[in-house]
Each structure stands twice: as C-alpha cells, then as structure tokens.
Amino acid sequence: MPQIKAVQTPIGALYGRDAIYLDHVHMNYSKKELVLKGEINGGLAAEATDGFVPYELIFTEVYYFNMIELDVALHLSDREYTQGSSFDELTDTPLLATIASARGKNLKHLMLKTYDDIVEIGCGDYKMTI
C-alpha cells in the first residue's frame, strides 16, 4: 500500500498551497537531470523563517517526470493530489513497481506541490539547496 511522507527540507516540512513557488524548470534529457528553482514561503515551513527563501532542487537519474497545473490536477479522479505536504516522498507506489519491472531500477517517487503546479518525479536521487 502506498505511503506518503513529508520530505524534511533544510527548513523542515512544508505545508500549504502558498509554501512553494516554482520559477524555473530545466530538463537535461541526455543527463536524465531535472532542475527546479524558485522560492519557499519561510512562514509555512516547520522551522519557520521570515520572508521567502530561494531554493534549487536537482533530481538525477530521472525516469519519470510529470507536471500538471494544480487546479486541473485537483479535478482528476485517479490521483490523490490533496494528501500530504507540499513536498512528499511516496513509497510502495504503482509507479515505482512499474519502473522496477520495466527498467530494473529502484527509484524514489517524489511529489512537489507548488502554488501553480504539481510536479511528480521518479528518480534515483535528489539534492535540495537553500
């Protein structure tokens, strides 16, 4: 059964639609690398800080990348986009099982819910810099 766990960022777990803003998306296809840049609303972090905090997320060994506008995602019946925090790691999901079967890879399944979009990634690893 799938499990959802909030990712602990350098300023703690993030909650709320206004917690993460996404300003830049870059996919390097040949390197299987996805880079996301934007700002975090520090007041919505578990370890609250004043103002907005810039972030960079680098996902490596990306085998799955899906980005959907938030309001559209909330109207889809096949996904539970409303659960969890603003940045979650999901385990025991059908996506992970499919990738393991098709490519023999044991990856991470991550979901980032920003103000405007939801980004879902199946990757080997990631690094967050604040």
Task: Spell out what each predicted region is.
Residues M1-I130:
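Surface-exposed, interaction-prone regions used to assemble/regulate multi-protein complexes
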